[in-house]
């Protein structure tokens, strides 16, 4: 793009008032618009999307805020099946209704003809033909602005701009998927030279209190679990806001850095919720910006210093790599000259432990520059969180500042492993053997499984499956059933015989780095932000959840090289959606709805099998967190503690409160799904009523609206029996018509011997009576009828000796399970 003859990169924001729930008289006023626009300009945003409100457009003209605008959604007179049939009538409507109101305003720089219309098959062809024809006519009317034909999905085939909507790192994939944008030819139409924009991305729709907004019957609840998992509710808000800012930072800075490789990358406009408060505010100051809003101020600095660092966890005394990038989008169009970078690795008190200065060459306007760094961490550095900080100075003035987080493990990080059971290993490659030797863990090697004792622990090293002797699985299963423990470190499970296991394990195949759209699979084989389902498990001793987000790369990757960094903690996860979880302890999981399993232990006979998807031994000597997890895994496996598929409970379980659930319900596997409840602002309660649909989803007025009504927040409120169900690749729940009659779900717990009663609190949020059946193990079910709009606590006597209970719910999917207590 060019503005006044000079190239310009578009630093945008896509979700803005008006029509977002703010009191109409306020949000349409010139004063409010000016305060809002000035705040965004202060955060270095230079383009926004707004509807056709003249006060807002006048303010954008006055404040120098560019606008991209037009028709969002279907054009007028279109239907869900086809575009408008009268082309010239549609063109006139564009001129008068959709684009015309913006035309007199110099701030308007891009026209949009439609948003996310069909793009494949015959419907897609029809839409492409219509939009191409409309564009051809409209440029006769105004050829001074470029056009987006089908925003998000059209990929530039019907107008001027190659526009994309991708929610990598929210609905699907991860922020690493942005690395695909370095391949310019993959993002162009043959024979065309087009500017590339992302006019929607990032997502991460946080609500009023910072937690993700779990809008019913949408993709939001599943995405929440992918990124903040089963953190306690009181920590969900902080974690969601932090990840939202992380995602915005990486999307915007990578997009700008990648111009070195793909000069057609021209603008990015995250579609995310930047403010806490909307409904009922009296002025702009009451909106309260979120951390993501302030992140714009850093990542959208006209002259950007940006850190590229793929080694997040470092051991004291080691050397790690990073790359410093500079992107010069100076608002005055000036070259960057006579400048230098001062950088430092700072501790929590902002005291540098390492620092240096890097002189900068002349960097022309709209140019980029980078240099690698090798940073040596002093050996006496204590364990903790550290910050890489860089500052560009020009003639003594600060031009740009940016930071990057680094975790350093000090001398006291590692703890010795003291096995109480003999450790045997099968390790053809030798990496695991070396790890054990370096950590003084006693072991013996074997290539035969005939002579194993029931006290032994048998570890199969990473990627060794193809080298196992014949009939190994039969021998390993027999060994486990006698009381042995098998530890299977990560394998290419799609190439592995899994039939010998006592439960069904389904391999995953596609990487989250794959940019195919729509996503071909729901759960990828690799992932970040791993969720420790059993947070008190010995395997996670000394490893907080944030240390399971990303691990250090071991391939010496940087963005000048093809491919992707090896930073996913899990690279070979698997599915347990058809497994009986009374036999399996899910220790860690990941992905949307936590459907992917990273680590589990399967009971069989008197012993067990541990399946692992973590990428561990490749990081020996590189990532102290991966090393600690592997040490903990070996320490647990060679100890006396047994798996706990039946979670021991001696407290009241508040369903939907993850700290109370303590990993009893693991996500996609038990059939008990979170029940989101909308909290409606006081000024909207007369207009928006809570509706319950036939599948039990509760919503305020209508489905969705997480972006148009950000002041309505959906929060966890119990769980509902929802199986059988599946997910679409896009991320929505899918229930077949043949399965709609009733839902099912279960949980497995072990209770104290003194308990003789089970108290279950159930809610019926509907206008009519509903039925639900409660069962325990193989004992007869008990039927309950819940009156309309009632909350009832029902009592079930435990007049049997079993202390390990599989509790099942069967019946109306609209039933809400609120609490369970054993007394």
Per-region residue spans from a language model:
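N-terminal carbohydrate-binding accessory modules
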Residues: 1-41, 58, 406-416
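Helical hinge/lid and interdomain linker segments adjacent to catalytic or ligand-binding clefts
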Residues: 418-509, 599-600, 606, 612-621
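Substrate-binding/catalytic cleft of secreted carbohydrate-active enzymes
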Residues: 31-286
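Short beta-strands within extracellular/lumenal beta-sheet-rich domains
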Residues: 720-757, 792
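Aromatic-rich peripheral "rim/lid" segments of glycoside hydrolase catalytic domains that contact
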Residues: 270-327, 339, 659-661
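Beta-strand-rich binding/interaction modules
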Residues: 319-360, 369-373, 384-393, 770-776
């Amino acid at each position: 793009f060019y503005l006044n003859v000079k190239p310009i990169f578009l630093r945008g924001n896509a979700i803005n008032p008006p029509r977002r729930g703010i009191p109409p008289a306020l949000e349409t006023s010139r004063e409010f618009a000016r305060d809002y626009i000035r705040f965004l300009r202060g955060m270095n945003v230079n383009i926004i999307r707004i509807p056709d409100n003249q006060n807002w457009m006048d303010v954008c003209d006055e404040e120098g805020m560019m606008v991209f605008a037009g028709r969002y959604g279907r054009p007028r007179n279109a239907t869900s099946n086809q575009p408008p049939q009268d082309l010239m009538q549609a063109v006139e409507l564009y001129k008068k209704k959709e684009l015309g109101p913006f035309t007199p305003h110099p701030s308007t720089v891009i026209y949009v003809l439609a948003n996310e219309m069909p793009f494949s098959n015959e419907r897609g062809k029809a839409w492409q033909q219509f939009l191409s024809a409309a564009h051809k006519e409209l440029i006769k009317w105004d050829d001074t602005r470029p056009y987006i034909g089908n925003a998000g999905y059209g990929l530039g085939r019907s107008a001027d701009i190659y526009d994309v909507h991708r929610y990598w790192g929210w609905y699907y994939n991860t922020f690493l998927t942005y690395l695909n944008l370095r391949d310019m030819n993959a993002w162009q139409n043959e024979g065309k030279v087009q500017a590339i924009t992302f006019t929607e991305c990032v997502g991460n729709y946080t609500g009023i209190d910072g937690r993700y907004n779990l809008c019913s019957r949408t993709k939001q609840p599943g995405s929440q679990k992918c990124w903040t998992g089963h953190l306690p509710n009181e920590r969900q808000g902080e974690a969601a806001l932090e990840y939202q800012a992380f995602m915005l930072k990486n999307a915007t800075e990578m997009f700008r850095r990648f111009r070195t490789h793909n000069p057609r990358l021209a603008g990015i406009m995250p579609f995310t919720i930047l403010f806490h408060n909307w409904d009922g505010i009296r002025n702009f100051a009451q909106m309260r910006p979120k951390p993501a809003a302030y992140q714009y101020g850093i990542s959208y600095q006209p002259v950007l210093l940006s850190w590229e660092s793929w080694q997040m966890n470092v051991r004291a005394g080691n050397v790690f790599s990073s790359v410093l990038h500079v992107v010069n989008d100076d608002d005055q169009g000036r070259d960057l000259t006579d400048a230098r970078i001062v950088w430092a690795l700072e501790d929590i008190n902002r005291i540098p432990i390492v620092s240096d200065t890097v002189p900068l060459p002349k960097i022309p306007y709209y140019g980029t520059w980078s240099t690698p760094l090798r940073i040596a961490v002093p050996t006496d550095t204590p364990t903790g969180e550290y910050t890489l900080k860089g500052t560009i100075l020009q003639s003594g003035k600060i031009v740009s500042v940016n930071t990057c987080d680094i975790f350093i493990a000090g001398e006291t990080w590692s703890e010795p492993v003291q096995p109480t059971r003999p450790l045997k290993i099968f390790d053809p490659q030798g990496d695991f053997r070396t790890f054990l030797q370096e950590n003084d863990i006693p072991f013996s090697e074997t290539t035969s499984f005939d002579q194993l004792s029931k006290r032994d622990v048998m570890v199969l090293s990473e990627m060794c499956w193809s080298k196992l002797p014949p009939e190994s699985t039969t021998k390993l299963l027999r060994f486990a059933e006698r009381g042995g423990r098998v530890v299977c470190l990560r394998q290419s499970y799609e190439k592995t015989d899994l039939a010998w296991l006592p439960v069904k394990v389904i391999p995953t195949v596609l990487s989250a780095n794959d940019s195919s759209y729509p996503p071909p699979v729901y759960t990828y084989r690799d992932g970040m932000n791993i969720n420790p389902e059993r947070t008190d498990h010995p395997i996670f001793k000394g490893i907080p959840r944030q240390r399971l987000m990303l691990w250090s790369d071991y391939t010496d990757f940087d963005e000048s090289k093809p491919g992707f960094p090896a930073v996913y903690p899990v690279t070979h996860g698997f599915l347990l959606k058809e497994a009986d979880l009374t036999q399996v302890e899910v220790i860690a999981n990941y992905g949307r709805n936590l459907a992917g399993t990273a680590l589990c232990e399967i009971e069989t006979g008197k012993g067990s099998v541990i399946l692992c998807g973590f990428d561990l031994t490749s990081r020996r000597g590189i990532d102290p967190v991966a090393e600690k997890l592997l040490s903990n895994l070996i320490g647990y496996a060679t100890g006396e503690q047994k798996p706990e598929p039946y979670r021991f409970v001696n407290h009241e379980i508040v369903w939907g409160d993850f700290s109370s659930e303590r990993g009893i319900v693991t996500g996609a596997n038990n059939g008990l799904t979170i029940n989101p409840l909308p909290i409606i602002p006081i000024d909207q309660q007369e207009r928006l009523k809570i509706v319950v649909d036939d599948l039990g989803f509760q919503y305020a007025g209508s489905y969705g609206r997480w972006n148009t009504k950000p002041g309505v927040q959906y929060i966890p409120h119990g769980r509902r029996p929802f199986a059988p169900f599946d997910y679409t690749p896009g991320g929505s729940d899918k229930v077949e018509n043949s399965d709609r009659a009733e839902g099912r779900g279960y949980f497995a717990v072990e209770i104290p011997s003194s308990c003789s009663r089970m108290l279950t609190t159930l809610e019926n949020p509907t206008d009519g009576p509903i039925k639900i059946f409660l069962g325990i193990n193989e004992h007869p079910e008990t039927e309950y009828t819940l009156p309309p709009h009632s909350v009832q606590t029902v009592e079930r006597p435990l007049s049997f000796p079993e202390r390990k209970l599989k509790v099942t719910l069967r019946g109306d999917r609209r039933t809400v399970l609120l609490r369970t207590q054993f007394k």
